[in-house]
Amino acid sequence: MKRITYLLLLCAVGLMAQEARSQNPAPVTFTAAQDHQNMMDQLGIKALRPGPSGDANASNHANYDEALANPFPTLPDVLTLKNGKKVTTPAMWWNQRRPEIVEDMDREVYGRVPKNTPTVTWTVKLSDKEFVNRTPVIAKQLIGHVDNSSCPQIDVNIEMTLVLPLNAKGPVPVLMMFGFGRLPSPSQPTPAELAKINDALKALLLNSDPSLKEIFEQHPAYQPFAPATGTGGFAGFGPPTPPREATPDIPGVPGVNNDLPSTEQLLADGWGYATINPSSIQADNGAGLTKGIIGLVNKGQPRKPDDWGSLRAWAWGAARALDYLEANEPTVDAKHVGIEGVSRYGKAALVTLAYEPKFAMALVGSSGEGGAKLNRRNFGEAVESLTGTGEYHWMAGNFLKYGASDATFGSKNPGDLPVDSHELIAMCAPKLTFISYGLPAKGDANWLDQQGSYMATIAAGPVFKLLGLKDLGVSNDYKTEKMPPVNTPMLDGQLAWRQHDQGHQDQANMKWFLKWADANIGHKTSTSSTGTRP
């Protein structure tokens, strides 16, 4: 009887899944160009202006002349309501002005997160005790399965790697980083364990192919799995690489990278870190918009003009990962979790801090257009760079309107945007916000518009001050303030800026971020940065 009941239950589950599939039309399969055209058709756009070229010899090369960089010099006032009334109290900011900005950002720039986003169930794939440099850690690989019962044809499994110091005396702050994570230094078999593995493997091979006996007798010292340095040896077996030290600073010689990897700096300071794979949340291309979390919620159908783009989707996924840390990891100080990213992931980090309330801080690296750079600036990367087929998927469909040269509504340009990036930075207040850039000569290209990002940071300052915090400590006149010299730390407030002397990375600013964040959250290193390998 129990067996019959079990079989009936299995049949019922199968029928329910089949019914869910039959109720949904098949997911649409578009190329990026087809999806882009679909959105143009929805918006009534007939033609878009091409984005500027990074090739200095091209006819439409990007502008790098500061005299031509500000065709729309006046930004929307971050502390003026749409009715013209000045915002003078924190209550007016929270209850009136910020909601206005959020609505415009949602509708026109980054898109709306649906109200019916599904739940995420996390599973620990493996947990491993490892060493990172001299710090003993516990490293975990996790999968967050997104409930796809509404559209079983689409699977979304969020990938996260979590690394925490093993000997912490209490909960530690964590920096979550957008990127492709892996276990830092997987533990290896001891010599005795390796010998046992080799004996078993040889026996298995001989049983499968007795002719191998002659080969093994000719090479008696051969071992299929041999200890090796780093990740050498057959199939990567071998001890981890030995501890590394940062090279000493060289006084008077700028541009020399003396920094350990960011992950090692974090652990040495008593932090943990997590890496979250953005592509496991939402593909980084337009062809993927009917898949991933955006496609799942839309049941495989194309976006509407105010639907979310990949930047909001990545931010949503990061927030679900923070939900897991808060609920399941007592050694994580969930009130002091930050978000980090560089380049497109720098954009995502800024969007995450602005929208997701549980994140306490961000290190926003070289984020450019769609991130900290002012949209109204004509310098390097432009709005039109993000309205073409290559990068439009980051944004709401409505963002395409601001690159339109011919449409049923006429044409629009960046000056028509109701909001700009200084307001995105202001949305982060009162949380700790560190804007980071590098040196164009070292690879952090002028294309990113460091000056335009500095202007946006300056223009966001009044909101931090209204909320009783400190900004960069200079005037809020974004039209006249110029960037300070390279390597000048502007870290006295909760809004921070530093341009380092390296390339397209934020590793060179990590020690500055940690010093600044530690001071603001009252963190003291709680782990030993030295350790002995077993």
Q: Could you tell me what each predicted segment is?
A:
Residues 19-113, 231-241, 516, 525-534:
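N-terminal pre-domain segments of enzymes
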Residues 177-334, 368-378:
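Cap/lid segment of the alpha/beta-hydrolase catalytic domain
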Residues 252, 293, 304, 320, ...:
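Mobile cap/lid helix-loop segments that gate and shape the active-site cleft of serine hydrolases
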Residues 331-343:
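Alpha/beta-hydrolase fold nucleophile elbow
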Residues 341-353:
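Glycine-rich nucleophile elbow surrounding the catalytic serine of serine-hydrolase chemistry
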Residues 429-449, 500-502:
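Conserved strand-to-loop "acid loop" that flanks and positions the catalytic carboxylate
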